[in-house]
Regions:
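Active-site-proximal helix/loop segments of hydrolytic enzymes
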Residues: 1-159
Length: 159
């Protein structure tokens, strides 16, 4: 995923790229709020199921959408999640239901940038290199579409 994004011209900050990183969700959210244009947390669901339930993103629960700071940002979180799911669908990746599951997360409740937690499957999912490449391709496609339509960056010539 990181190499593919770098190849597309993105700057990528991996807040947690090893097993020994001890940053909690609040710390990760604060870091991303200060240095990133968007925050995407990639996970494999540890649901204990004996089957692959597919990918989904954690959408903001209805009961939180009017609370601050969530009210100002949830629509962008949702747009990012939908874009990622659309990219995964284009690669024929299994999607759980609509692709969105309401979950109250620190990350989306306190993020001041577009932010999404995406579950790429679970312990029963295919974790082969081929499948991981398809997941990465779908995510990059979703990120590209989201950035094109939602993140406005001034052209270098105007700086």
């Amino acid at each position: 995923q990181k190499k593919k994004l770098l190849a597309e011209g993105y700057d990528v900050l991996m807040v947690r790229d090893g097993k020994d990183v001890q940053l909690d969700n609040v710390a990760r959210t604060v870091i991303c709020n200060n240095v990133a244009d968007c925050h995407i947390a990639l996970h494999w669901d540890s649901d204990g199921l004996s089957y692959d339930k597919g990918c989904f993103y954690a959408s903001v629960p209805e009961k939180l959408k009017k609370m601050r700071p969530v009210a100002s940002y949830w629509e962008e979180h949702d747009a990012l999640g939908k874009s990622l799911i659309k990219g995964l669908r284009s690669q024929k990746i299994k999607i759980n239901g609509t692709g969105a599951t309401e979950i109250d997360l620190t990350q989306t409740s306190y993020s001041t940038i577009p932010s999404v937690d995406i579950e790429l499957g679970n312990q029963c999912s295919d974790h082969s290199d081929r499948k991981l490449q398809k997941l990465a391709d779908g995510l990059v496609q979703g990120i590209n579409k989201y950035v094109k339509h939602h993140i406005h960056v001034a052209p270098l010539s105007s700086l």
